[in-house]
Regions:
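Hydrophobic core
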Residues: 9-17
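Generic structural signal for hydrophobic residues
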Residues: 9, 140-141, 205, 262
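Sec-dependent signal peptide recognition
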Residues: 2-10
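Intrinsically disordered, low-complexity Ser/Thr/Pro-rich tracts
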Residues: 1, 16-23
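Hydrophobic alpha-helical segments, especially transmembrane helices
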Residues: 3-4, 62, 237
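Active-site-adjacent loops and short helices of periplasmic peptidoglycan-processing enzymes
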Residues: 20-180
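Residues in and immediately flanking transmembrane alpha helices
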Residues: 15-16, 74, 274-277
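Domain-terminus/edge residues, biased toward the C-terminal soluble/receptor-binding domains
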Residues: 147-151, 161-379
Length: 379
């Protein structure tokens, strides 16, 4: 039996060499490692040392922030929940929200700082309060990594000393892009948090691309003198999302230029091709034998699109459906497929269903109905 796949923008026909960077690659990127990905595609569109684990500066905190955002998304943490800052959390160095030991502050305020500036004190405070202890929080972060297929072991919740590959960052970024709470703050350039005593701390997102690159909605940046400038970015245009990770750029400007070059390449090279929409009629008035109606519309149950190289040519369609169909037919049982081809080669198939049930009017069914009627009336 044909296996049908109907996923929005997750099946891709890419008619160009993709994978490892080398001489003659169509983009020039100044960084130690990088990759360009499309969520749902296992292999990167382009990469240089994309699977090689490296130090990623502040992005080592991304698994913790993602775990927290998922907890907010699921309702485990409410934004209005008051949380107390421990001496340990208040002692965290690096980018911070300037929290003070013993201070009480709402979880929603802490989340802003965790996402926008990777504030270590806010991350630890959220983790300690929401999960009961840092060790339990760390266990939950490890679960997040395992679910995403990232085999890394963290020694603390902030990821001290951990190495991630560019592809790891894109995988984490793809998960973060699905989080409502993460995206809410990752796309904000400037905000502030209000402490319990009325004191305010201004937050400025270091990701300049959310203001300078059309469609960029995040995700996170980081830098350290010895590790360079790192970032994972996501851009959405025309319902297509690309992600890029850059590790070890020499400057902030190089980091953003690298990501911009990768996105420019993607939008210049690929185009989405819409195939079907959920509930859309793919074949009107398809003939039916022995039914209580002579025809039925055939519809797709899912959205389906391809992402093609702009030079790929025209996508053609044929219907792989018995003509005519024979009743009975059921709206939840597939009767065939719409098959899409490129250059004569099948590239995608979408399952088709009757738009409505069609009862059978065959002689056998007629005799059965007569028999049932006879029994109901007592002969």
């Amino acid at each position: 039996m044909r296996r049908f796949v109907s996923l929005l923008l997750t099946v891709f026909i890419l008619l160009l060499p993709v994978g490892t960077w080398g001489e003659g690659e169509p983009v020039e990127v100044s960084a130690s490692a990088w990759c360009l990905t499309l969520p749902g595609r296992a292999e990167p569109l382009l990469d240089k040392k994309g699977t090689e684990p490296m130090s990623v500066a502040g992005l080592r905190k991304l698994p913790a922030v993602l775990t927290l955002c998922r907890a907010f998304d699921s309702g485990l943490i409410a934004e209005s929940t008051g949380m107390q800052v421990s001496p340990h959390a208040a002692s965290i160095s690096g980018p911070t929200a300037f929290l003070e030991s013993g201070e009480r502050i709402e979880a929603g305020e802490l989340l802003k700082a965790a996402v926008m500036i990777s504030a270590g004190d806010a991350i630890v405070t959220l983790g300690e309060n929401a999960f009961g202890s840092e060790s339990v929080f760390l266990n939950n972060i490890q679960v997040t990594l395992k679910e995403l297929g990232i085999e890394r072991t963290l020694t603390d919740c902030l990821g001290t000393g951990v190495a991630f590959s560019a592809l790891d960052l894109c995988t984490l970024g793809a998960a973060a892009a699905k989080s409502q709470h993460f995206c809410r703050w990752a796309g904000q350039y400037m905000e502030h948090i209000v402490h319990s005593g009325g004191r305010e701390t201004e937050l400025v997102n270091a990701n300049r691309m959310i203001r300078s690159y059309s469609g960029c909605f995040g995700l996170m940046t980081g830098s350290r003198k010895e590790e360079g400038y790192t970032g994972v970015f996501a851009v959405k245009r025309n319902d297509v999302v690309y992600e890029a990770a850059v590790i070890g750029a020499k400057s902030s400007e190089d980091r953003f230029a690298a990501a911009g070059s990768l996105f420019d390449y993607a939008f210049a090279t690929f185009q989405p091709v819409r195939l079907t929409g959920a509930g859309e009629v793919a074949a009107p008035d398809w003939p039916v034998l022995s039914g209580d109606r002579a025809t039925v519309d055939l519809v797709a149950h899912e959205d389906a699109s391809l992402l093609l190289n702009k030079s790929a040519g025209k996508v053609d369609r044929r219907l792989d459906v018995e003509d005519p169909l024979t009743a009975p037919l059921y709206a939840d049982v597939t009767v065939g497929s719409a098959v899409f081809t490129l250059g004569g080669e099948e590239v995608f198939a979408v399952a088709l269903y009757p738009a409505a049930d069609v009862a059978s009017h065959s002689l056998v069914d007629l005799l059965r109905r007569v028999g049932r009627s006879y029994l109901r009336t007592g002969g």
